[in-house]
């Protein structure tokens, strides 16, 4: 079978290009509203808080690109949901001055879907594939040639033949929470791999204060910003969502402009109560339901079983609920009349499945005390 090679060329340099962001995937309506509201997402490396080592590495690669005008190496960003993988990828495109094509892997059902993205790219563009581990194995294999030689094969049904198509050079950035689901050969084609770390409370606090200034034109008190950060489950997305709901409550509570002195602890706790977020460690309804389920079953459970029992998608359990529960969580509780401070995970993963820890038990007991004070009125928090 012969190949007919086609060449697509775009003669533009970074300085003459008008950068655009192309979100190939249509996000769920609720997420889209959230992202539109969160237009304070950092646009460049200087605006990104934390991840210093990663930023320094990326700056070096981009400096080389600007000097040689050769595409930056393909990159793989690792880290659980909410640590800023998409933000970092978008910042790379902004720093380079190139177009940013964003696609969710779950929307790529066939090679034709991916080719529709490839045929529109310009020289040195960024293609960002979120949750790249969700790509079908065959599609992962077809990426090899694209990433190495910038060529791909497409089937021409009209001419009943396969064509080898030359495409513009580009940089692929993949984001994943599960490297084990990627082909080893595909992983090896990403020349730069980096682990994005969870944010510290101080970093999240700084994000909250910066967002308050940019979006709401108000100085969020340091004490309030830090408390919101501590309840953000180590992720920027949760911190921004808490700030948004906090400011919505403040706006609804006053006829005039919200001032810094109006942002009080009482108002913050009112917001948390309305949103069913605990003031202890910041867990929401779904996370508490997860823990209650484990505690009641008193046996190891698989992620699929838990997802079914709490009426959530397994991907939500794996990528959104579990990462924080598996991390070290600071908790204070009474045990045998003594105040105990624990810094341990709420769950553990064993060969038989997920099990709850003693910390999870004491956390639910604290939530029961809150329920007696009017919190979580519609939740069943009873355990043995």
Predicted regions and their residues:
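Pre-Walker A (pre-P-loop) alpha-helix and adjacent loop at the N terminus of AAA/AAA+ ATPase modules
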Residues: 32-74, 78, 115, 119
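Walker A/P-loop
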Residues: 63-103, 117-122
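Conserved AAA+/SF3 P-loop NTPase catalytic/coupling segment centered on the Walker-B
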Residues: 91-92, 111, 123-153, 179-189
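AAA+/SF3 P-loop NTPase mechanochemical coupling elements
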Residues: 156-175
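Conserved AAA+ ATPase "SRH/arginine-finger" region at the nucleotide-binding site
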Residues: 177, 192-204
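The conserved phosphate-sensing helix
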Residues: 222, 232-247, 283-285
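Conserved C-terminal helix/linker of AAA+ ATPases
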Residues: 225, 249-276, 287, 350-351, ...
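Short amphipathic alpha-helical interaction segments
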Residues: 311-329, 335-339, 351
């Amino acid at each position: 079978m012969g190949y007919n090679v086609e060449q697509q060329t775009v003669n533009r340099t970074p300085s003459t290009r008008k950068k655009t962001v192309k979100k190939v995937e249509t996000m769920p309506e609720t997420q889209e509203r959230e992202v539109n509201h969160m237009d304070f997402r950092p646009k460049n490396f200087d605006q990104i808080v934390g991840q210093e080592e990663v930023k320094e590495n990326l700056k070096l690669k981009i400096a080389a690109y600007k000097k040689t005008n050769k595409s930056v190496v393909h990159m793989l960003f690792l880290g659980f949901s909410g640590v800023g993988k998409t933000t970092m990828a978008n910042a790379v495109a902004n720093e380079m001055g190139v177009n940013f094509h964003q696609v969710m892997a779950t929307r790529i059902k066939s090679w034709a879907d991916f080719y529709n993205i490839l045929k529109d790219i310009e020289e040195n563009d960024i293609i960002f594939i979120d949750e790249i581990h969700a790509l079908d194995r065959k599609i992962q294999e077809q990426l090899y040639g694209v990433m190495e030689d910038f060529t791909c094969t497409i089937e021409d049904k009209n001419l009943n033949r396969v064509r080898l198509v030359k495409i513009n050079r580009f940089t692929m950035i993949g984001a994943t929470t599960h490297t084990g689901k990627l082909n080893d050969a595909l992983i090896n084609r990403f020349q730069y791999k980096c682990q994005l770390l969870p944010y510290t409370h101080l970093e999240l606090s700084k994000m909250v204060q910066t967002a308050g200034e940019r979006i709401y034109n108000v100085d969020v008190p340091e004490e309030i910003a830090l408390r919101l950060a501590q309840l953000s489950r180590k992720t920027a997305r949760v911190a921004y969502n808490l700030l948004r709901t906090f400011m919505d409550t403040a706006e609804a509570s006053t006829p005039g402009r919200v001032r810094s002195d109006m942002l009080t602890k009482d108002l913050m706790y009112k917001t948390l109560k309305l949103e069913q977020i605990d003031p202890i460690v910041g867990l929401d309804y779904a996370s508490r339901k997860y823990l209650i389920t484990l505690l009641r079953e008193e046996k190891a459970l698989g992620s699929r079983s838990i997802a079914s029992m709490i009426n959530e998608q397994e991907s939500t359990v794996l990528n959104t609920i579990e990462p924080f529960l598996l991390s070290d969580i600071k908790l204070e509780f009474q045990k045998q009349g003594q105040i105990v401070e624990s810094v341990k995970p709420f769950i553990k993963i064993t060969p038989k499945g997920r099990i709850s820890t003693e910390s999870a038990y004491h956390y639910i007991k604290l939530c029961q005390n809150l329920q007696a004070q009017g919190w979580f009125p519609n939740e069943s928090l009873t355990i043995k």
